[in-house]
Amino acid sequence: MCAYRLQYSLRFNIYDRFENVCFEAQLLQDEIDSLCFLFSKYFNQSLIVDSKGLTFFTEFNKCIVSIKSSFENQANNTDNIHNVKNIFSIFLRDEFIKQVPHFRTIMQYLQKYYNPTPAPDVDAIMCQSCKPANKIQCFECKCKYLASSLSTLDAGLQNGWDIFLRPMFGMPLMLYVLLRTDYKNESDIINENNLITQIFVQFFYNLICDKAYSLYTKRDMCVPFVKECKKATVGLRQEDHERVLSILSAQCNGCSTVANGDRLLLPFKNFMIEMGRNTKMKKVNKIASTVLIGFYLRHYLESLPNKAYPVAELELRNVCRFIMSKYSDENINLLIHKLKLIKIDICNVLMTEMIVPETFIRHIITKYQLDNEISLLIELNHDCFNK
């Protein structure tokens, strides 16, 4: 089959100076059709992008299989935990990918609690032949839509996102194109590994900066949840504030670790029952942990009185204790301290470097002695979003 040259642009900046850099990827027509279909699902524009005969899981799985194959063919990829592709492989596990079809259901249901995020301007893309049907149908328009989707996704990953599942779904699509981009005419700093590093570092920074809640959550819509959680958390010990996620997760699995654990779980249980009714999901318990981590946990934490930490840090502590379940209090405190310092380092590099080099990852892991944490994440033999 004939390969097409797709031109797209990504945004880079130093302080307030922004620069759009044009890239060129070589893609087959089937790949372009597949990526357009997946991006139309990502941006909730599937009704105006023609994609007959394609199914979400099949196309997304093709994307993941291709990325994993590319990563596995890289020399020393499996031997070096400092390799950004090895770290990124955490998000490419089969257990995690099986959850992705549910992610779309979750994103669609929770969208009403978030401010809208930018999407490609379809009207500006459509040619005169496609406009009568109000649908992107011709190959040329699909190429334009794909290029616009990549630029919009890139800006969205930099500016922050509404639901934490969004980058989980979007980053593999970007990765797929980066792995098919020609870097021969680019400067040494602009290469595959550095661009992947740039995306990962920006993603991680936004995650620990609490951008989703602070910038995109419609807090007035969530007030009823906080009120319900306030009733349920009465009597919860302060030392358990950073274990709420672990307590609720255990309670979901029928293991009570605190007094009145069933009462503590009730607000979230009611929310999931209502979500099940509205989404027609037969086994809503399959997505319970994902919804709890990504959305409802925050309302429990907002409702707590006499908090020892800011809510954003309390949320981070809950997630760290949940994932690093065998860590002692001392180890958790040390990890949180490291993350605070890492956030400063990342902020500095994002502001002063147009492109963050892969060596930055190695520098951070070595500087803060993160080999143990990275190894634990890479070697997890279960899906931490579905314990």
From Swiss-Prot:
It comes from the Viruses. Pfam families: Baculo_p48. Transmembrane segments: none annotated. GO terms for cellular component: host cell cytoplasm; host cell nucleus. Keywords: Host cytoplasm, Host nucleus, Late protein. It is found in: Host nucleus; Host cytoplasm. Plays an essential role in the production of budded virions (BVs) as well as in the envelopment of occluded derived virions (ODVs). Belongs to the baculoviridae p48 family. This is p48 protein.
